[in-house]
Amino acid sequence: DPPWAYKVWSKKGAGRSAESHYPTMDIAAIKALPVGELADKDCALFLWITFPMLREAWGVMDAWGFTFKTVAFVWIKQCRKSDGLFTGMGYWTRANAEICLLATRGHPKRAARDVKQVILSHVERHSQKPEEARRRIEALMGDVPRIELFARASPPGWDVWGNEVASDIRLAERM
């Protein structure tokens, strides 16, 4: 889940924007990350995006050396304390879903055929993804080396990198 930088349209929106929660990166900086050098020759990329970043996501996947395959997950967000649908931000419509794109390089093997696309789950803190997504990635890909970039936690069986965790690797930006 890259820390996408968004255009803010109002002072009210600025207080709820990603920039008010954590440092963000512009598209050029995200593309410059050496993800392609880190990735195995046969692997999958799960890239969380919000709909305003859909076009940019294709450029990021290309820059990292991956080919889009499908939408892996559609997270329908529920309110923190109820099962009602969460109301997020949005200029045209209020966002209450996020998608995770699946891209590959080489020929990774699929370990399971019964992994579902839709995740109905409560929101937690800003930008935190549901644990169910991690479980589904593990089921889909099987017991392979895994790394989460921009991680917020260090789950068992995963290497992590990010500014909110003790990183297992060091990334040098190619800028």
Walk through the language-model features, giving the residues of each.
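Class I S-adenosyl-L-methionine-dependent methyltransferase catalytic core
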Residues: 2-175
